[in-house]
Amino acid sequence: MTHSIWHEKIKSFLPEHYYGRINHFLDEAYASGLVYPQRENVFKALQVTPLEETKVLILGQDPYHGPKQAQGLSFSVPEEISAPPSLINILKELADDIGPRDHHDLSTWASQGVLLLNACLTVPAGQANGHAGLIWEPFTDAVIKVLNEKDSPVVFILWGAYARKKKAFITNSKHHIIESPHPSPLSSYRGFFGSKPFSRTNAILEKEGMTGVDWLK
């Protein structure tokens, strides 16, 4: 299901048999209708970014709910898919902050230790937040709690009111939080643009003696 170290750590923050409940939920959801992302990509964020390599978290709310968009990484879409509005604004801020990036697929961020996690890992087709409050929040809250226990610093990038509520789980003074309004068109001009999260993240990592992220890769 996930990278084994993630699995063992996450389980310690969940009720007994919670993984079984998740699997039952997934069986029913995928049998009853069209759900994104593809089932094999539900836990992709944890599969491609091992716990021991994670140094940044970018928290999204739930997967894109349009055809072929969601790929299991927050805000990312496959290269051949047009960038949704939030991703357009993320790339615009990146261009203003560090430089232009033409790729819509953010997998190269994930491979550098940037955990691209959504709070809900599935969504029914065409129904934003359709699986909110059903199964995922205790699981993804546990992921944040696992990161909070890390001895090495993690930069938590929290965009929007929903993500910022998760600050309650980040109590370890070794870690750093960068927060701003959400990059969606509704809120991007209220403080997301100009917030420079990418250069600020690298400045923190380098100050901590860690390698910065090549955001343009």
UniProtKB/Swiss-Prot annotation:
One of its GO terms (molecular function) is uracil DNA N-glycosylase activity. Keywords: Cytoplasm, DNA damage, DNA repair, Hydrolase. Its main location: cytoplasm. It comes from the Bacteria. GO terms for biological process: base-excision repair, AP site formation via deaminated base removal. CDD domains: UDG-F1-like. Its EC number is 3.2.2.27. Belongs to the uracil-DNA glycosylase (UDG) superfamily. UNG family. Excises uracil residues from the DNA which can arise as a result of misincorporation of dUMP residues by DNA polymerase or due to deamination of cytosine. This is Uracil-DNA glycosylase. It comes from Streptococcus pyogenes serotype M4 (strain MGAS10750).
